[in-house]
Amino acid sequence: MLGDATSSEEGLISAAQRFIDINISDSGLQASRIAAAVGISERQLSRIFADAGQTIGRYVLNTRLDFAKEALSTPERDKVSVSEIGKRFGFASPSHFSRTFRERFEMTPLQWRKESQRQTFQD
């Protein structure tokens, strides 16, 4: 869960998180759509996430990156290109995916794929 939130806000955050998880492949996933799905205004959604310690945009981006990182780590990883994995989780371009992945995890998606493969073989 994100930072400190009231129980009412936690329920809204949980609902928003579920909606984001279900719609993560949509590159057009925006705060306005998430807010509408949860039944609150975009401003309320932004405030609740900010109060909990993260902007809604950053939360969506981090969720995309977490899903992509997991996909790069699965046994089927070599059957799907890095670009396709980025696209699958809503990144508009391979360069945007690679850049944001590297900023967060300090390695490129391809480096992560190779590292996770190496770890799999060592286990």
List each language-model region with its residue ranges.
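A short, structure-level motif marking secondary-structure boundaries and short turns
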Residues: 1-3, 15-17, 66-68, 83-84
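Short, Lys/Arg-enriched anionic-surface-contact patches
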Residues: 3-15, 55-64
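DNA-binding recognition helix and immediately preceding turn/loop
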Residues: 12-57, 75-88, 92
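Alpha-helical DNA-contacting segments of helix-turn-helix folds
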Residues: 49-67, 71-72, 100-118
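Sequence-specific DNA-binding recognition helix
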Residues: 75-115
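Intrinsically disordered, low-complexity protein-interaction/activation regions
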Residues: 121-123
